[in-house]
Amino acid sequence: MENDKKHNQKQNNVDENEFPNSKVLLVSVKRTRRFLERTARELLAGGTRYIILSGLGDALPLCVQLQSSLQSKNAANVVKIETSYSYFNSNYSYTPGLKIYMEKHPEFKGSRISPGYVSFHEKTDSFTPIYDENPNEYICSLNAGDNNLYVGGEGINGAFSELLSSHNQEVDKYESLFKELLTKAVNENGEKPDEEVKSVLYDNVDKKYPDVKLALCRIRNSLKKGSDHSTGSVFIVTFKKNFPHKKEKNMGMVYVVGPKGKNYNSVEEFLDEVQETAENLMTTLCDYNGLVKREEIKHVRMNTCRICLFSGSIFKHPNASKLDVAKAILNGLAVGYRHGPSPRLNFAYDENVFKDAWVETTGLQVFNHNEQ
């Protein structure tokens, strides 16, 4: 047994020297090929250069099938194959083994976000609805907010105000709620690097804000302007009552304060901050679902988040296109993506830029929302 450990450690060192920036994917018949292929693609999309497919015994056929699938889809190419025949004391027998070394294909794009988690609205005679009249799953919808943290005004922020007010919500109170939450988030996280920032909750929120069941906020310190931490901040509120279209599955609002193009001299800086905001958005969504998994009796999981083009239209930089903004949003979401806690992402229609951005940045197929 000790000799086996030493041999494995020596082999790992050889692999690391010959194939830097590599990951070993253990292939087992307990996992489906679809799961293994998705994992391999996520690793490649995340920056891994080499995937080492490793299987023993009855997993060998699956290992070869996985290699064939990745190669046929221009995800990775085979650079080396090793076979082995090892004796295992545990079952007193020899077991065949296989290692297939694959390098990322030069044309591979991919995304850390599983394609099945992404859907796109098609063009209709009117805007994509903020909420569905008959939702079949728990959904939050994204509101492109303002640095002053109010719900109202023009664009989708005004549409949120009109819709929520029509269902007897006290919309004017959201501004004070968000400002209190932002202050708490800054007090607890304002001096931390972004990777150490935590989402903060408003304790007993329904006592002061009776429409709200849960409220949380996560800031992005790298985007603060002077003492103002609002840019890049993300708020999630779930409703306690007065649900849109009187449907409990229209569960809440995600309020995102994206950067405004007029505040940036460089279009590159603007798009970088859109991407950072989107990364913070995804992290906050995952934080929420992670929280409710621990407290599922009190709160429900967010199955889907409907996402509009924040920092787009009149708020984008004059030298940026809507497609540029959509790409920055998708790239940021991919950076923050965690497969377990992430909700599915449903993108609102806006000149088809989200679907175009997905195809251009990932090379992956799209799923039609209307066929879900």
UniProtKB/Swiss-Prot annotation:
Gene: ALBA4
SUPFAM superfamilies reported for this sequence: AlbA-like
GO molecular function list: DNA binding; RNA binding
CDD domains in UniProt: MAF1-ALBA4_C (cd21101)
Main location: nucleus
Domain of life per record: Eukaryota
Entry annotated with the keyword Nucleus: yes
UniProt keyword annotations, A-Z: Chromosome, Cytoplasm, DNA-binding, Nucleus, RNA-binding, Telomere
Transmembrane regions listed in the UniProt entry: none
Single GO cellular component term: nucleus
This protein's name: DNA/RNA-binding protein ALBA4
Localization per Swiss-Prot or TrEMBL: Nucleus; Chromosome, Telomere; Cytoplasm
Quaternary structure annotation from Swiss-Prot or TrEMBL: Identified in a TARE6-associated complex consisting of over 30 proteins and including ALBA1, ALBA2 and ALBA4; the complex binds to the non-coding subtelomeric repeat region TARE6.
Protein role: Possesses DNA- and RNA-binding activities. Binds to DNA fragments longer than 14 base pairs with relaxed sequence specificity. Associates with the subtelomeric TARE6 repeats. Regulates the abundance of transcript sub-populations in a stage-specific manner. Regulates activation of male gametocytes. Participates in the coordination of sporozoite development in the oocyst.
Family per record: Belongs to the histone-like Alba family.
